[in-house]
Amino acid sequence: MNPGDEKRMKIRKSELKDLERILEIYVYARDFMARHGNPKQWGPTCWPPEDLIRQDIAEGNSYVCETGGGRIVGTFFFVQGADIEPTYREITDGAWRDDSPYGVVHRIASDGSEKGTGAFCLDWAYGQCGHLRIDTHGDNSVMQNLLKKLGFVRCGTIYVREDNDPRLAFEKSEKVHG
């Protein structure tokens, strides 16, 4: 996170009025990933679909990151609880380090206009629960580097329900360091 981010950016729950802007951010993110060696993670299926984003908003699990001026520059899914992510129940090549209730971030994306948006969103989510899990595609080196920079540890591999595609699983916990 950059100095002054707290004054510059804030997180709030997404509203239906934000949908068009959220969709624009995902278009940018898919293009960014394709240009940075990760064309498969969201590109072929135009992930995430609009109906899933609408569902996330309706269920109160979609968030946006706004600048101090109210411009939406990032978005993500966040939920927390005990055993809340079914695909995280089975992990190969390793193990989760903390079995306590956790938060999950999915579908994190920014429009690229504000440096540090992804870090700000992840720091906010971690601050809500002190134990966060996230997964990413093996080709998503940008996200892998960000997670490592923020103190997340790679724990193994999980498989996404929709297509049984492998994802690198990361975790950060107040209870387990290093």
Regions found by a protein language model. Give the residues of each.
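Conserved beta-strand in the GNAT
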Residues: 64, 71-81
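Conserved acyl-donor/pantetheine-binding loop and adjacent beta-alpha core of acyl/acetyltransferases
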Residues: 77-113
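Conserved active-site alpha-helix within GNAT-family acetyltransferase domains
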Residues: 139-156
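A short beta-loop-alpha structural element at the N-terminal edge
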Residues: 10-24
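Conserved GNAT-fold acetyl-CoA-binding loop/helix
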Residues: 31-51
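Conserved acetyl-CoA-binding loop-helix of GNAT-fold acetyltransferases
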Residues: 113-127, 145-149
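Conserved catalytic-core motifs of GNAT/GCN5-like acyltransferases
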Residues: 135, 153-167
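Conserved GNAT acetyl-CoA-binding A-motif
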Residues: 104, 128-139
